Amino acid sequence: LKTLITNLNGHCLFNASRKTQTEGLIILHEGKYRKTDLEDFLKGGDIKIETEDPYEACRRIEEIIKGTKKHGRVFVAYNGRNLGPLLNFVANKVGVDGIFTCYNDKVVRLPLLKLDISGTKLKILNILYLKDLTARELGEEVKISRAMVYKHLKGLMELGLVKKSDSLEKYSITNAGKLSIS
């Protein structure tokens, strides 16, 4: 079963469903939603993402994508409104069979982006999610040398996932870092 998960509507939704030739359709929305004629022909439905918290929205979208992947191939089509950017981010993070966007009512396939974070960097992010720590404390928690901690922190800071905390001694996770591990 090929399924399209989307926040699109109108011509863009119709064009995306034709381009992906899906049998299933899941429309994600945040509130008011008008059913389309297309839904009568495809299996699926609409899912309301009921949260103001972007991290929780990402977790919910991830659950939906992973649950849908169990039944076959998954494609994502999004626009820049509301859930669209989060849907794109999670689709790239989790990995889907194709990502599409709509530009001037034309459907454009986008390349999949890979968020390449090593296991050690992921451990550091998960620890910093719980509390801010110094490089020495991180080394003790992760059980690596302080030099390696600084190397990993530098890479994470360049990606915008970690920053020096207000005390300038400790490191803390950024909002982007929280999204990357959500």
Predicted regions and their residues:
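Long, low-complexity, Lys/Arg-enriched
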Residues: 1-73, 82-88, 92-182
